[in-house]
């Protein structure tokens, strides 16, 4: 399956006017602008993340891999994708989920206003073991180096699934990783991901969404960063082997 939608839900991202370093100004919530960039990348085939797995419910693991994909020639037909050899697949083992709902988040690490917007997958579903992995979310943004992360989604049918619905990717993104991710916003220009997350000047304007900075013990270090959550869906594609 190929991800056909993706939206940043938390943290919200804010643009700061730093023309005068002594007078920083909170300009705008640009979360939807970034989501527009993500959506354009997917729609145009510039970003193709494939979710590959065996027949449900016998599936034990999923593979997340970049693909080279072509849009369908006729409306309603599936995309045609070839798994890419340019980057290694992310192999994630699955854990059993007996509860009716499948995500396993701590809502207290997210903004209260964002929690109702997070996808809440139900059965039948797949949930990966919690762990550390690096996953590209866009050709424009790059790969997120996540800790304590999980990939969760419902299937539209337990026997012959054609879609992943109500998907949620969540985990902790360390500051050092977010600082190395740069994306281009229309009008606003290039920004590092961390520069639109760590925005204390915006807190008074958006008190129910900020602050979003947190910490996580990583080995012997209490690392600053942010807990993030991304909604997604995926659709079945035709897999074409590489020539």
Say what each PLM segment does:
Residues 1-243:
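Extracytosolic secretory-pathway proteins
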């Amino acid at each position: 399956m190929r991800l056909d939608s993706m939206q940043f839900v938390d943290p919200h991202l804010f643009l700061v006017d730093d023309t005068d370093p002594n007078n920083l100004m909170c300009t705008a919530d640009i979360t939807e602008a970034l989501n527009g960039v993500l959506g354009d990348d997917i729609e145009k085939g510039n970003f193709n993340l494939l979710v590959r797995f065996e027949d449900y419910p016998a599936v034990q693991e999923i593979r997340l891999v970049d693909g080279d994909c072509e849009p369908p020639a006729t409306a309603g037909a599936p995309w045609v994708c070839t798994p890419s050899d340019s980057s290694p697949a992310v192999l994630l083992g699955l854990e059993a989920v007996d509860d009716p709902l499948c995500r396993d988040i701590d809502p207290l690490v997210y903004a209260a206003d964002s929690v109702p917007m997070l996808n809440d997958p139900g059965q039948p579903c797949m949930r990966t073991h919690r762990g550390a992995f690096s996953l590209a979310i866009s050709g424009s943004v790059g790969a997120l180096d996540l800790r304590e992360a999980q990939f969760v989604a419902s299937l539209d049918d337990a026997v012959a699934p054609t879609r992943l619905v109500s998907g949620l990717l969540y985990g902790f993104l360390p500051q050092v990783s977010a600082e190395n991710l740069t994306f281009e916003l229309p009008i606003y220009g290039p920004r590092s991901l961390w520069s639109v997350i760590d925005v204390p000047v915006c807190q008074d304007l958006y008190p129910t969404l900020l602050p979003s900075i947190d910490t996580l013990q990583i080995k012997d270090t209490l690392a600053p960063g942010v807990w993030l959550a991304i909604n997604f869906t995926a659709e079945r594609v035709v897999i074409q082997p590489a020539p």
